Amino acid sequence: MTDLNLPSIFVPLVGLVFPAIAMTSLFLYVQKNKIV
């Protein structure tokens, strides 16, 4: 459990979570426009 191990796990996690949130926001935005 070193300080170098934390960014190793944290960076890919953010790299996957951030695009997932962006895709979800875009998906909800498109669905809202289709309904209205």
Swiss-Prot record:
By its UniProt entry, which Pfam families does this protein fall under? PSI_8
Annotated compartments: Plastid, Chloroplast thylakoid membrane
Q: Give TM regions.
A: 9-29
Task: Name the Gene Ontology biological process terms.
Answer: photosynthesis
A cellular component term from Gene Ontology for this protein is:
photosystem I
Highest taxon, organism lineage: Eukaryota
Tell me which InterPro entries the record gives: PSI_PsaI, PSI_PsaI_sf
* Keyword Plastid tagged: yes
What is its membrane topology? Single-pass membrane protein
Q: Which family does it belong to?
A: Belongs to the PsaI family.
What is the protein's given name? Answer: Photosystem I reaction center subunit VIII
Report the source organism: Sorghum bicolor
User: Mind giving the lineage of the organism this protein is from?
Assistant: Eukaryota, Viridiplantae, Streptophyta, Embryophyta, Tracheophyta
